[in-house]
């Protein structure tokens, strides 16, 4: 009998949720996703130091000899995302998702400008727009930024999605893909209800993604649904048939070593009816988010987590560039690093 991973791959596009190139080579997914936490983790692996140094040197050339370490590192944050994305694309046939700085999540214009810059860097590296998804947090401001970018031919992946109103707004904005989270929803319910275990079909995260998937397909939205943030393979099994599922290497390994029959649970050609299209304006969006403690808390937590990962990556890059440039003429006194 085929493994769960092989069976799943026949009905759903499997995406690797990692910046680890070795894991991507092992599991051979079609697409891959990254986020600030994954990039930070990869940046601490000795084998990837060459990629980090490449980005820092390229950033120094871009900023110029008299630019401060801080200016170089700010530039390098974008360069590193693209350097890792470029390497990932060498090992997959599909798309890589690269995330906009989470600290811009409530600034539409800054998000648009950052996304345009990331795409310019990819294009400069010879990579076309159709192989890149720009990840943006599913705030109202982020969704509006994605609407602008999609009109420009820049494809977006709206992440940190926990409430149905976020999904509906994304569909109306015409975004390419959304990443509704499963495991983080489960985490919240386990912590706040006193219920320690939820069977797969009753998992609140599974229920959320299933509703979104059927709503999109019933109403003929083109936006793809990619379930994300899994805690166990039972959640993945319950979403078999979803457009895409982005899965960590640990769970990909479990799927590849489990040999039981897999039933297709979601069918884009025969979706279950879940109601007519709903209009989501800014006021309704904020009202629905504010009345959903889980979604409000998890969106806030996710943005803070990714923002901290960027802060931590900046510190590591400042330390690294100081080592690389120590004693050189452009390591000016004004570049001193403060912790």
Swiss-Prot record:
The active site is at residue 135. Its EC number is 2.2.1.2. Its main location: cytoplasm. Pfam families: TAL_FSA. PROSITE patterns: TRANSALDOLASE_1, TRANSALDOLASE_2. It catalyses: D-sedoheptulose 7-phosphate + D-glyceraldehyde 3-phosphate = D-erythrose 4-phosphate + beta-D-fructose 6-phosphate. Keywords: Cytoplasm, Pentose shunt, Schiff base, Transferase. GO terms for biological process: carbohydrate metabolic process; pentose-phosphate shunt. GO terms for cellular component: cytoplasm. It is found in: Cytoplasm. It comes from the Bacteria. Pathway: Carbohydrate degradation; pentose phosphate pathway; D-glyceraldehyde 3-phosphate and beta-D-fructose 6-phosphate from D-ribose 5-phosphate and D-xylulose 5-phosphate (non-oxidative stage): step 2/3. Transaldolase is important for the balance of metabolites in the pentose-phosphate pathway. PANTHER family: TRANSALDOLASE. Belongs to the transaldolase family. Type 1 subfamily. Homodimer. NCBIfam families: PRK12309.1, talAB. This is Transaldolase. It comes from Prochlorococcus marinus (strain MIT 9211).
């Amino acid at each position: 009998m085929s493994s769960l991973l092989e069976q799943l791959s026949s009905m759903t596009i499997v995406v690797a949720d990692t910046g680890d190139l070795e894991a991507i080579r092992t599991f051979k997914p079609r697409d891959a996703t990254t986020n600030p936490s994954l990039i930070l983790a990869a940046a601490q692996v000795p084998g990837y130091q060459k990629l980090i140094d490449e980005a820092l040197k390229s950033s120094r050339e871009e900023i110029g000899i008299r630019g401060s370490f801080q200016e170089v590192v700010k530039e390098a944050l974008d360069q590193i995302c693209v350097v890792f994305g470029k390497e990932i694309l060498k090992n997959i046939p599909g798309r890589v998702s690269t995330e906009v700085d989470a600290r811009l999540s409530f600034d539409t214009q800054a998000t648009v400008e950052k996304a345009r810059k990331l795409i310019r860097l990819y294009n400069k590296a010879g990579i076309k727009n159709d192989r890149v998804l720009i990840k943006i947090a599913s705030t109202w401001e982020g969704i509006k930024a994605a609407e602008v970018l999609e009109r420009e031919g820049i494809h977006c992946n709206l992440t940190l999605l926990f409430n149905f109103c976020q999904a509906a707004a994304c569909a109306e904005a015409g975004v390419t893909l959304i990443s509704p989270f499963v495991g983080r929803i489960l985490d919240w319910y386990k912590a706040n209800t006193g219920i320690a275990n939820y069977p797969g079909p009753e998992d609140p995260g599974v229920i959320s993604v299933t509703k979104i998937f059927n709503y999109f397909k019933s109403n003929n939205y083109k936006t793809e649904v990619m379930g994300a943030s899994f805690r166990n393979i039972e959640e993945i099994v319950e979403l078999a048939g979803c457009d895409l599922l982005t899965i960590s290497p640990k769970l990909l390994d479990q799927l590849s070593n489990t040999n039981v029959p897999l039933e297709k649970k979601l069918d884009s050609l025969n979706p279950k009816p879940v109601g007519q299209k709903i209009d989501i304006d800014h006021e309704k969006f904020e009202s629905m988010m504010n009345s959903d403690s889980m979604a409000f808390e998890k969106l806030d937590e996710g943005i803070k987590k990714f923002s901290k990962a960027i802060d931590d990556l900046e510190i590591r890059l400042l330390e690294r560039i100081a080592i690389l440039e120590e004693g050189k003429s452009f390591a000016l006194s004004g570049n001193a690093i403060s912790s």
